Amino acid sequence: MGIKFINIGYGNMVSAARIITIVSPDSAPIKRIIQDARESGKLVDATHGRRTRAVIIMDSDHVILSSVQPETVANRLYGSDDLSEEG
């Protein structure tokens, strides 16, 4: 059995097995998590300069910012097997 990767936009992929949660960046607690990750060097910005629409928390305490909607990332995680399509 191979490692399953999820496309989070613009050709960026993350390991599906290591995702803890996928959330919207709008709430104050999530903004604090993003700032803490930035200060500790564990923030990965995969937005390519676009608006952050999803925040992905990994089991390694890394925080990944994506410009893809959280629902889209979740659908890619639990939905289709074709994970290389851009959405």
From Swiss-Prot:
<dbReference type="Pfam" id="PF04025">
    <property type="entry name" value="RemA-like"/>
</dbReference>
<protein>
    <recommendedName>
        <fullName>Putative regulatory protein GWCH70_1057</fullName>
    </recommendedName>
</protein>
<dbReference type="InterPro" id="IPR007169">
    <property type="entry name" value="RemA-like"/>
</dbReference>
<comment type="similarity">
    <text>Belongs to the RemA family.</text>
</comment>
